[in-house]
Each structure stands twice: as C-alpha cells, then as structure tokens.
Amino acid sequence: MLTIALSKGRILDDTLPLLAEAGIVPTENPDKSRKLIIPTTQADVRLLIVRATDVPTYVEHGAADLGVAGKDVLMEYTGQGLYEPLDLQIAKCRLMTAGAIGAVEPKGRLRVATKFVNVAKRYYAEQGRQVDIIKLYGSMELAPLIGLADKIIDVVDTGNTLRANGLEPQELIATISSRLVVNKASMKMQHARIQALIDTLRKAVESRHRS
C-alpha cells in the first residue's frame, strides 16, 4: 500500500491533476467527503487528508510514504527523515516580512509576529539582528496595527490583504511552491514504485511548465 498525505485547499486542488497523470484518482471528492482516508482508482494507493503543517510529520514517521507540502512548511519543519525530490511548481507564493506602510523601523530589538518561528530566528540570526519573536497562529496583520509587533513574517500571494490592513510587503525571505516529500525508509523499501511515480510527476510538471 502506498499512502500519500495531502492537505485540503489550493495544494490539493493543484496536486490532483498531477496525480491523475500517474493514474491515481480519488474515488471520492476529497473537498466534499468527510473521510480522511480516501481510496483511489489504484487499489494499492490511498490518500490521507491532513493539516498542511502535519504533512511532513506524517511522512517522516512513516504514516504516509509520500506527501505534498509547501516549502514554507518544510522550512519551518525541523525533522530529518524526509527526501524532497521534486518541486511541483504549484501553489506559488512568497514568504516575506511586512510592516505598517511608512513606519520607521526601530533601532533597538525588533518585535516580529509570525507562525514561522524557526524561519524567523534563522533569517534574523543571519542578519545579526536582535529580535523578539511572537508566535501567532493567524490574523498576523493585526499585530503591527495594535502595537503587538513591529513586523510580521507571513506568506504573501497578491499582497491585497496586507494593503487592506495598512501594511506593505518588505523583505523577500523565500519564493514558495509545493514540493513532493518522501519517507526515507519508504524510498528504500518501495524504491521502484516511488521512483516511477516521481518520474511521472516530473514529466507532468515539465509538460505544464512548457505550455
């Protein structure tokens, strides 16, 4: 049995057509089904529907053989039991700092609100900047508006939400897209099967990119 971990939303919607190229099609609509384990048209392949931030955990610990996760999630994840063989070039966005429009950056310690705590620590450590990291799980845009933080680090797509709340994108930390991740033990035990799937997905990605 080959188990693939996916999260609902944009990543799932963009991944399903790629899996279809490999003949893997869910037997139920994952967006409408309440099931978290979904069979596919290949009897020995199933999909796990999990939270986006949990995909690497399921894969590293062998609950799933493969998964699809955003590079932002993988940058924040601290585990080591994963291969990242393929950039699927889907769900593209940017991981950026943002702050109030026209605000002057403080000269002392910077207060940064984010759910990407590990990313923030590495980013500012590389700059030699002293910062206080404030972990939030959502509504990041509020933090600078009410004085909780000087800046935020968050995923930015169009930037419209930032601008609607009086903020502006500032420094680019990373360009994000979704990646295929593979459990290291699964890659050894089911190498031929998984490598064939990787090769098929790579061809599908390249074909899309050319068109």
Curated annotation (Swiss-Prot):
Domain of life: Bacteria
Record bears the keyword Glycosyltransferase: yes
Location within or outside the cell: Cytoplasm
Gene3D superfamilies in the cross-refs: Periplasmic binding protein-like II
Main location: cytoplasm
GO molecular function, one term: ATP binding
Annotated SUPFAM superfamilies: Periplasmic binding protein-like II
EC number: 2.4.2.17
InterPro entries to which the protein is assigned, alphabetical: ATP_PRibTrfase_cat, ATP_PRibTrfase_CS, ATP_PRibTrfase_HisG, ATP_PRibTrfase_HisG_short
Catalytic activity: 1-(5-phospho-beta-D-ribosyl)-ATP + diphosphate = 5-phospho-alpha-D-ribose 1-diphosphate + ATP
Top enzyme class: transferase
Cellular component aspect of the GO annotation: cytoplasm
Pfam family, one: HisG
Family: Belongs to the ATP phosphoribosyltransferase family. Short subfamily.
The protein's role, per its UniProt record: Catalyzes the condensation of ATP and 5-phosphoribose 1-diphosphate to form N'-(5'-phosphoribosyl)-ATP (PR-ATP). Has a crucial role in the pathway because the rate of histidine biosynthesis seems to be controlled primarily by regulation of HisG enzymatic activity.
Subunit organization: Heteromultimer composed of HisG and HisZ subunits.
HAMAP family, sorted: HisG_Short
Name this polypeptide is given: ATP phosphoribosyltransferase
